[in-house]
Structure formats: C-alpha cells, structure tokens
Amino acid sequence: MGSQEQRALDSLYAIDNVLTIDITMPPTDWDAVRTEQPAGGVCNFEWTGGSRYTWREATSVELSGTKFPVRTALPRVGIKKKSFCGSISSGKPCLHLDFAKFSDANKDPVRKLIGSRYLTLNNSVQDLSYLRQLLGYKLFELAGLPFSRGNYAQVRVNGVPIGQGEAGVDSPGVFVNVEPVMPRYVERNFGHLNGNLYELEHEDDFIAERFPFIGVESLSKFDDKADLRFAIDHIGAHGLAGASEVFDLDQFVKIYAMEFFLKHWDGYSRNTNNTYVYNDVDAVAQPGVDDIDFKLIPWGLDQTFQPARHFRLDTAGLLARLVRDDAGRRAQVVGQIRAYRESVFGFQTQQEVLKPFLDGMGTLLAGFGVPDVPTQLTAVRKQLRLAASAGYLCGGLPGSAGAYVRDDVTNECLHASRSEVIPATAEEPGGAEVVHRLRPANVDDTDLWCFAPLGAGQSVGSKASGQPLHATTTTSGQGHPLLCTRAADNAAQAEEFSVTPVDPVGDDFGFSGWFTLTSIRTGLGAAFGTDPTATGKPRVHQDANPSKLYFS
C-alpha cells in the first residue's frame, strides 16, 4: 500500500477540509460535458457498449482545500459527466475528474499532491440535505466494512459555480466529494490490487442472465470475468452452500445488516444496484473454487434514511434471498443487527461520534448557503434514532442493559418516579408514578426499561428499581387509567404488555422503528399525556389511542 498516497488522501478527504475546484475550459466544451446524454439512453441498464459518456479535456483545474492541499493548478485534465439515471442533470451534472487522462506529465505531480489522479463529484440532487452520503460511509466505516472517504467541494467552471442561473438547481457549486472505487480505495480497504473488481447496476445479480451486463473495472488483473462466471455457475448448481464457497458470506451478512439500518433501498439487497464486488485473492487465469473470495462494496448512498421507507431485510438480491431463507444464516443476520445496534447505532456512538459528525457537516453546509439545514439535520437525526429502534424490534427487545422508551411527538422518555406515588385503593395497591420527561444529558437508570417474556406478553421493568410496570385500574382526575411501578405481582396479567410494531402490518422483515406498548390486562396502550401528578409532572397513562413510541 502506498502509505504516502494514503496519508495525502486522508488529508484531502478530511470532513472539515472543504475543497475549492476551479475548472477552466472552452464554454462550448463545458456545454458539451454538461448536456451530454448517456450512450444507450437514460436509465438503460442493459447497456454493454462501454463508457456512457465522453472524456473531454479541461484547459486546467485548480485545486485547493481549507486545510489541504495548497492551491495548485494542473493543465489538460480529463472531465466526464457521471450518472445516467437518478442523479442525471444538465444544470448541475455529477462529474469525474482524471488529472492524468490527457497528460502523463500530471501523474507524478497529482500523486504527490493528493495521492490519486481521480476525483468523483456528486451533485446530491437526490439528497438535498447533502448529509446522507457522507453519513452513510461513516456508518460503514464504524461497521468495519469497505467505505469511501469523503467531504464537500465548491466547484466552479470558468469562475461560475456549477448550476448557477440554471432552473431548478439547488445549492449551485456545492458537491459531495466521494472517494471513487479506484486503486487507492481498493488498496486501503483490501490491502492489495491483485484481484478483479466488478460493478453491479440495477437488476445486475449473480445469475447467468445478468452476467453480460456486469461491468469489469479497469484495475482488474483479468478482464474476461472468468471468476465471476465460475461463481455464478457454482451458486446456480449448489445454492447457499455454493455461495459460501465463492463469497465471504460473513462479510455479506454485515453488508446486509447495514443496508437494513440505512434503509438502503437502492443497494444490493433491495434493488440489486449501487454495488461493487471484489475478488479478494490473487486472481488467476483459470479460477476454481479456491481462487474466489468475493466481497461486496457499498456505493450510491444518497437515498438512504428516507423517512417514507422502512428498515427492511429484503430479498431482491440472490445472496440476500439465499441468506434470509436459511434459518441459520437468518439468525446470523439478526445477531449482526443486534451487534450493530449496540455498537454503530448505540447511545454512546450516537452521542460521541455521530452527533459531532453531523453538527460539523451542518455548520459547513449552512456556510455554503444550503437551505433548511436545521430541518434536514433534524430529519436525519430522527432516522438514526429510528434505526436503533428498528434494531430492537428486529433483533430483540432491550434486556438487562435497558433502553429508553420515547414518544415520537415530544421525544420525551418514559420515567419511573422515585418520589411520587399513586395511593392505594381498595382494589389496587399503590405504586410509583410513571411520567415522561426530556432525556437528561447523562444516563439515568430511572429512564431505562428492561424487557423480558412474561405470559402473553412482556414484562417491562425499571432498570433503577427492578420493579415492573403495572397497568392499574386506578384512574386520574381526568379519568385515565394509570400506570405505575411496584413490587412484582402479575395478578390479572397486570404486568404483561405487548410490543406491537407500527407499520408495515404483516411484514416480519420490515419495520418503521415505531411501536405501541399495550396492556394485556386492559387492552389500553401507553400514552404520553398531560394528566398531572400531584407536583404537576405529565403522566404516562393508559389510553385507547396510544402514543407512537420508539427505543433509543
């Protein structure tokens, strides 16, 4: 691995290093770049005729960063339009830059300057928050999977921010600078360049019918796709057992779990798209089963964390279908979801890593003039919280470590009072009040709840006291049956609650992240209401219209 190049790329792609890229070229040539239509047509996934766009020569490209590199201009740089479907745009096109496409003399200077000859600039037209791509790759990094480095770039052509004055263009000149899957990427993520690399676009899969359409990347040691052909035939003949011999299925299980958490509907498992696959061995001319170890590479994360979509273990991809349909492998995926729920999406990571990461991006984006940054940040943060909650609903409810139970509307958490009690009546013993409050900055066990199977439902216990939640028949002044915690006594199933996922109904593998908590005893659900305790704190009571809740 070229350590000097990797260090330069680390500096180049540092999240707080904003690049300025000034492209100079004849206006007619620029118009040809931005307005070019893809060979084969828009959204044609059956194209086998090579590159969809034409490389053109920029007179010069000047590159600098707020921290790295120093302002440097290079002549005769290759520039090509990118994206032939969802992100296609003539007003603000995605771009590939190759600093040595037309000049070998640029190879050494650009390698020393930034570590690579290639840049990929995404227009983010499908993610106007400009947050999701960089957040998604950060999450894959935290998961220990292949990931792209990335940051932001302000890009001008002949002194004008790209897209300025063009109808319908959001945030002219602002681009997401994502590390492409090229030699330095493969070196960093796999430690060598001796394998073969392929790209899967929409509908491409490890099946014979799609073999002709799967593209082989130029860094591959061989370009005849012999290893890919062998793998496809081997899976066709031997199913899951065959797949386990030519794919790193443990790595795939991790990819599968992360696509679940990111709602990556445009990735491999849900749409057979936006995926590279690398044969992580020294490639040979006539491969057999011992010469193949394919690993997946995630790509195209701009449509992750969309609020209208669900967290789902889908089976559009053959590997996903084989894995989900097998009881043992399915259990492995669920176990991986549990593991990532605690590590990548856990409270500590969210507070110490993801919150400052998002805050930093938000500050930069506001400085660029990107609209509605606070609103966009709020929406993405909510998706991160719901991802953790979906991890509980799919991977198993909170155990002895406990978790917050929070209301979707207020984001307040279920709290077991230490000081206020519900008086005993002739029908009911007393108990500690259950209220809702804002989550404190520091973890307090009175806000954490532990679940365990009990009778027809779940016991819901306060981590602080160990006492279970009870559905009482005692009513408040406003007529609502109350909840309380008290010593264990499951008479009349008062301690049993059902946790029911909210939407999609009847889908064992899809989750919104929300749920309702309903008493088996009364059939009423937990509602974060306004009924006051004696000291004016808002109660969580029982109601026929329960609150929509989530775990965090």
Predicted regions and their residues:
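Conserved NTP-binding catalytic cores of kinases and kinase-like/nucleotidyltransferase enzymes
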Residues: 1-130, 135-138
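Extracellular structured ligand-interaction cores
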Residues: 18-20, 56-58, 74-76, 92-94, ...
